[in-house]
Amino acid sequence: FSAEDIEFLRSKKIFDKEFLEYLKDFRFTGDIYAVHEGTPVFPHEPVLTVKAPAIEAQLIETYILLAINHQSLIATKANRIVRAANGRTVLEFGSRRAQGADGAVIGARAAYIGGCAGTACTLTDFKYGVPAGGTMAHSWVQMFDTEYDAFRTYCEIYPDNAVLLVDTYNTLKSGVPNAIKAFKEVLVPKGITNFGIRLDSGDISYLSKRARKMLDEAGLQCCKIVASNSLDEYLIRDLMMQEAKIDTFGVGERLITAKSAPVFGGVYKLAAVEDEQGNIIPKIKISENTAKITNPHYKKLYRFYDNESGKALADELCVYDETIDGTKPHTIFDPDAIWKTKTLTDYSVKELHVTVFKNGELVYKQPSLFEIKRYCAEQTETLWDEVKRFENPHNYYCLLYTSDAADD
């Protein structure tokens, strides 16, 4: 804590001198264990575990929750949108509707991890290396005497990857025809084929089909069609079902704010304390709402995989000093109907937590953002499609390890 920080806290007149002196030399000395960034996780699982003196663990609580909750929320929403696009490119276009500057910049980073190919936020490219790109604005078109002049000038200034916004006046009667004319007069003679148009209003499915027909008839089969305008996974799924002729989706406000579910409810709870003799004493939070009752104790998280398919079968929590023997048959059960059991034989098991900090020192080698994105895609692929349904997904179980029954 800086001198300025200490003086501010002193001015509140609620902290004693000893505490303020402690903050002057404060440093984190504990251990932190976490799943790799990009790992799909499920409710009631410990994404991150802090083992530290109580005051140190409490002082970092708010920032840990802020970072994990927001990034997990946006990455999850992005992943749903990318899966709905079924192989079509998805770009993050949400900066102007984000909840603050940090929400825009960090949100675009999370969207990239979730599967977006790039962002319209240049600052995210500068800070994190997420590929930035974009298209023209309606104001560009409006500043010229004619729509064609706007398109031609844009193609001359930005000949590489020129994407023309065709809905300022009339998409099919002027926008697409003027775009075709500009492409054929400016870019095609130079041998440039990397260009496109963007649809930002109207019936995107209908307009994309008509625009595609017009472009193809003009010999511009190479021209890409980008669609934007309040898109999310549900609308994109509908557009795909309607066979809309869209190559790239630019998704803004409904991604960067996770509009359909704008809160990620991660919590930070005490699970155990260590007494003077070094014994770990489990702690539990009781609630009349069963969903808010915490699983006590200092825990490890394991994931089981089917060896034949490579798909994840279930996750299991065990106490820190327990180990799951992956060489023996292992019984899992439905936690809502414990008489329903299944014995795993041809499986592998993986502990998901890795050490990030040890005795206050960073010991984890941070992968590149591209490596995190790739890891996220690989791990998401290990989940059954039924688990990833948008509506009524199949239950994926996080179980409590029972050593007596599990390895019979």
What are these regions (language model features)?
Residues 247-263:
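Glycine-rich phosphate-binding active-site loops on the catalytic face of alpha/beta enzymes
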Residues 226-233, 252-254:
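Glycine-rich beta-to-alpha transition loops that act as phosphate-gripper elements at the mouths
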Residues 259-277, 373:
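C-terminal helical cap(s) of enzyme catalytic domains, especially alpha/beta-barrels
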Residues 305-399:
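C-terminal terminal segments
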Residues 401-407:
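Conserved small/polar residues in nucleotide/adenosyl-binding loops
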Residues 133-136, 245-251:
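Short hydrophobic/aromatic-enriched beta-strand-loop microsegments
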Residues 14, 20-29, 38-220, 231-235, ...:
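Buried, small/hydrophobic-residue-enriched core segments of structured protein domains
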Residues 1-14:
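Extended boundary segments
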